[in-house]
Curated annotation (Swiss-Prot):
Entry's localization field: Nucleus; Chromosome, Centromere, Kinetochore
Coiled-coil residue spans: 24-124
Alphabetical GO biological process terms: cell division; sister chromatid biorientation
Domain of life: Eukaryota
Tagged with keyword Cell division: yes
Gene: SPC24
Organism name: Kluyveromyces lactis (strain ATCC 8585 / CBS 2359 / DSM 70799 / NBRC 1267 / NRRL Y-1140 / WM37) (Yeast)
Subunit structure: Component of the NDC80 complex, which consists of NDC80, NUF2, SPC24 and SPC25.
Name used for this protein in its record: Probable kinetochore protein SPC24
Main localization (coarse): nucleus
Family of this protein: Belongs to the SPC24 family.
Lineage, broadest ranks: Eukaryota, Fungi, Dikarya, Ascomycota, Saccharomycotina
Free-text function comment from the UniProt entry: Acts as a component of the essential kinetochore-associated NDC80 complex, which is required for chromosome segregation and spindle checkpoint activity.
Alphabetized UniProt keyword annotations: Cell cycle, Cell division, Centromere, Chromosome, Coiled coil, Kinetochore, Mitosis, Nucleus
Gene Ontology cellular component terms for the protein in this record: Ndc80 complex; nucleus
Length: 189
């Protein structure tokens, strides 16, 4: 029992019964693993922080682009509005509609004039050649009727033949063409 009373001996004996080398080795390995894990986590944290900075930078650039596009869109919308106001689109549309209506009326008038000329031509060609005589009692031939018809056509188009020149009666009787081409037209008559 004396052994139990001596604390130093008791500690030595207790210590000799314990095998702590494996525990120390395990603790060292755990410490090493913890250091590696801490280092790996720090690297991952650094990587994630850098990635977050990049993403925030990209987000900022995209937001700047969106703001620029919004501003550009607003400016273009404003310009379109100004142009519409300057052009007075509804009035232009009314003017265009009015011009289209006038063109249609002119087309109808021209069509009626052509129809009258065609009817006159039919009448002249269908008239009995024996019944038509000039002042000298000479019969009017088919060629003469065609010439008269052509002259009436020129007259209905407000064009006159004067001194071998075609004159536009709508435009202060200005010549329509050179004398050589009007002379050719007169020869065809």
């Amino acid at each position: 029992m004396s052994r139990l009373n001596d604390p130093v001996e008791l500690l030595q004996q207790t210590r000799s019964n314990f095998i702590i080398e494996s525990d120390v080795s395990n603790i060292k390995e755990i410490k090493s693993n913890m250091r590696q894990l801490t280092k790996l986590m720090a690297e991952k944290q650094t990587h994630h922080n850098e990635l977050m900075k990049q993403l925030q930078s990209q987000l900022q650039r995209q937001q700047t682009k969106v703001q620029a596009l919004k501003k550009n869109f607003q400016e273009q919308t404003s310009q379109v509005k100004r142009v519409e106001d300057e052009l007075n689109i509804p009035k232009l549309q009314q003017d265009i509609d009015k011009l289209v209506q006038e063109i249609n009326q002119l087309r109808d008038t021209i069509q009626e004039g052509i129809q009258k000329v065609v009817e006159t031509q039919k009448q002249l060609l269908n008239d009995d050649t024996d019944a038509a005589h000039t002042i000298d009692e000479e019969p009017i031939g088919k060629d003469d009727k065609i010439r008269v018809l052509k002259l009436k056509l020129f007259h209905s188009l407000d064009v006159a033949l004067y001194n071998d020149q075609l004159l536009d009666l709508r435009n202060e009787a200005r010549p329509l063409s050179s004398s050589s081409s009007s002379h050719n037209i007169w020869d065809e008559l």
